[in-house]
């Protein structure tokens, strides 16, 4: 190989290295296997109730693969290298389904083709904020539908979940996992009341902190 030829190639190689894109990082809201004793198979809180999360709606602004961060000045930033492994609405639905199934001892991802579940769940998220190094926030309305003693029952509730987070995207993702788990806990409380024959009421959500 001649020296002039190498001289011509070197700038091209250096330019290619300088322009290499940053690696993408993928995140999920689906938590690892729970180790909470309250979720153990022999827990008295389990109901073995067939429950299905049928639909989860997320604001269009954040229902995407890219993570969307909220700034202090009201601006938002689209993080092209910090990605959810699936669109955010699917991530929330999968995480909710898993958390509720673990709480109640029901089948994970109940197949509605097997017949109507005892309780169907629909969730509409009105606000989902991600503030790096500060908080993860979810405001949502959820609706339960069930049949008991030939009666059609419906319960509509509002919920709020706020989790402080540390620095880094991993901490932010864990904060959202805790927020989703908090909503799943509230839904599970109402399902347990129905299963026990009690009054079907909305649980009392935590009060929003002052930001």
Each model region followed by its residue ranges:
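Compositionally biased, intrinsically disordered linkers/stalks adjacent to structured regions
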Residues: 174-211
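Short secondary-structure boundary motifs at beta->alpha junctions and helix caps
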Residues: 75-83, 149-189
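Generic beta-structure capping elements
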Residues: 54-56, 70-72, 143, 147, ...
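Sec-dependent bacterial lipoprotein signal peptides
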Residues: 1-17
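Extracytoplasmic/secreted envelope proteins and their assembly/folding machinery
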Residues: 89, 93, 97, 101, ...
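A structural "domain/chain start" motif
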Residues: 19-88, 196-211
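Surface-exposed short loop/turn segments
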Residues: 20-38, 44-47, 98, 102-150, ...
